[in-house]
């Protein structure tokens, strides 16, 4: 149920107008990008979400709502309300673990997602890389960062192997192990893109796990594993730059020291992989 309004409302106004019988249960963090809170009434629970990035355009939040509206409930929470700065979605019962599931199970989830109809908007990384450069702390901008940005701009993004709807933030904290199977939460970066980009972006523990995930996916997608792995590797520099830039951007935005540590670690990975 989308609800259009140019006037922002408070949390209490949201609850009193749309969920008068519900009460907040708890606030929880669902990843590095922000928090949400639960509301409940007679055992029924919803998650109330706000944009993780207060500086992002409103269209980005609306896209997340549209993505959730068209995804099947077996892999994503269904949305119930959207209005400026607020979204209410189903609460997904289950366990959120600190490690990834079996690679074959995860490959099955991603392959099923990639078989769904496209969202209708493309994921393009270069504008994000340039935005993070421009919005980062000037003292943190280095010659090496600018050189890599220019190199990627000249090279252009890899041509997609297969174009599909992507989640683009697959890590242990965004996977719910439910009684009916794996489900994904936090769809704020969703869009259409290369399946290899999704696979490259998964937050794996090591290269061995990454290759096994790609192999399991290739079996389902009927792609030569070596061909898919080559395409995944083409995306590595783009994704490392994306992560490093996002951490730098969030550091300037929040002042949270964890983002500096994560940025420094990602820059080191970039140097190793060059």
Curated annotation (Swiss-Prot):
Source organism superkingdom:
Bacteria
Which keywords fit this entry according to its UniProt record?
A: ATP-binding, Kinase, Nucleotide-binding, Transferase
| GO molecular function, a single term | ATP binding
Q: Which GO annotations describe the biological process of this protein?
A: thiamine diphosphate biosynthetic process; thiamine metabolic process
Q: Which reaction does it catalyse?
A: thiamine + ATP = thiamine phosphate + ADP + H(+)
- As recorded in UniProt, coiled-coil segments are none
InterPro entries attached to this UniProt entry: Aminoglycoside_PTrfase, Kinase-like_dom_sf, Thiamine_kinase
What EC designation does it have? 2.7.1.89
Q: Sorted alphabetically, which Pfam families does this protein's record hold?
A: APH
Q: In which pathway does it act?
A: Cofactor biosynthesis; thiamine diphosphate biosynthesis; thiamine phosphate from thiamine: step 1/1
Which enzyme type, at the first EC level? transferase
> Which protein family is it in?
Belongs to the thiamine kinase family.
Q: What does it do?
A: Catalyzes the ATP-dependent phosphorylation of thiamine to thiamine phosphate. Is involved in thiamine salvage.
Per its record, how is this protein called by name?
A: Thiamine kinase
User: What organism is listed for this UniProt entry?
Assistant: Escherichia coli (strain K12)
